[in-house]
Amino acid sequence: MQEKTGSPVLRNARRIVVKVGSSLVTNEGRGLDADAIGLWCEQLAALVKDGREVIMVSSGAIAEGMKRLGWTARPKAIHELQAAAAVGQMGLAQVYESKLRENGIGSAQVLLTHADLADRERYLNARSTLLALLQLGVVPVINENDTVVNDEIKFGDNDTLGALVANLVEADALVILTDQKGLYTADPRKDPAARFVHEAKAGDAALEAMAGGAGSSIGKGGMITKILAAKRAAGSGASTVIAWGREPQALIRLTQGEAIGTLLVAQTQKIQARKQWMADHLQMRGSVAVDAGAVSKVRDEGKSLLPIGMTRVDGDFSRGDVIAIRDAEGAEIARGLANYSSSEARLICRKASSEFERLLGYTGEPEMVHRTNLVLTR
């Protein structure tokens, strides 16, 4: 970890995903702050006019919906939150459309769910649409489609959504703007010896230990969600900046190469696009546990997973679904596309491929997950 960053990452970035937190676009959670959004839109427009492609992932729909509905306390019932989101999305889209249009730039509203990104065809359709919008010089304003999702299929927070969008469009950089100046070695509110982290490698295990709990009562994500988002975005080669959103002209200064906030640098080697799609699954239909020999073959030697190395099959999945591969302790080591359904996998678990025809009634692939359809996660 470095004390100072002079990295050209943002200066050279042509495609940027910007995530702005609730506290930066609302009046302390009481509706949208149109003036603040206007300042963001001025910067977004300047970046587009400079030849960059920009996507905005913005919170604020529920806060705006609560204001329009006259609610003073955030509801706990999921259907009430969904109702607030539906009402608030109208206002959120209107403000961004108005403020960007004032700066001569078009906007588009895009609402995503995890199901959109988990399904390969819908994933590719979403990617094609976003890339088309960027080529047209339009700024897509993205939020989770809270109206139709529940806790089991939510992204969970917009930090995660920002990282997934960065991977979806293969962005050069992810900028997470928050109400904190960046990452410290400890909570500076509790530890006067806490040092500011200017630069580190995304995915550095020490970062997660540094991150505290939730920072703001308005949004959902604390620093830990931002650290994990940076780790996820790094898979497609996107470096991440976590910066204080109240910093004047933060986006402009970052893209001019100024050191603001914490820079989390991505690994140099990108994950193949299709494997990145598999890695980005937040929920999976099932998993298989494997023995130590299979762990070594898959993780250390880059081999396919054979059914003879499986010890247990969990969940209910179909052929072609993304499943997790876990070691004896239950830790995920990889994930990939299943060549067999869960019911078939249970029949061939611990069996050699020579027995498949007798057990299944047909001769299929010898692998449970072929190495070309497998991505390591640990």
UniProtKB/Swiss-Prot annotation:
Binding site for substrate: 59, 146, 158
Gene3D superfamilies named in the record: Acetylglutamate kinase-like, PUA domain
EC number: 2.7.2.11
Family matches, as Pfam families: AA_kinase, PUA
Keywords noted in UniProt: Amino-acid biosynthesis, ATP-binding, Cytoplasm, Kinase, Nucleotide-binding, Proline biosynthesis, Transferase
Gene Ontology biological process: L-proline biosynthetic process
InterPro entries with a match to the protein in the record: AceGlu_kinase-like_sf, Asp/Glu/Uridylate_kinase, G5K_ProB, Glu/AcGlu_kinase, Glu_5kinase, Glu_5kinase/COase_Synthase, Glutamate_5-kinase_CS, PUA
Pathway: Amino-acid biosynthesis; L-proline biosynthesis; L-glutamate 5-semialdehyde from L-glutamate: step 1/2
SUPFAM superfamilies in UniProt: Carbamate kinase-like (SSF53633), PUA domain-like (SSF88697)
Domain PUA: 285-363
GO-annotated cellular components: cytosol
Catalysed conversion reaction: L-glutamate + ATP = L-glutamyl 5-phosphate + ADP
Enzyme category, top tier: transferase
Single annotated GO MF: RNA binding
Binding site for ATP: 19, 178-179
Location(s), subcellular: Cytoplasm
Recorded family membership: Belongs to the glutamate 5-kinase family.
NCBIfam families membership: proB
Function, in words: Catalyzes the transfer of a phosphate group to glutamate to form L-glutamate 5-phosphate.
Name of protein: Glutamate 5-kinase
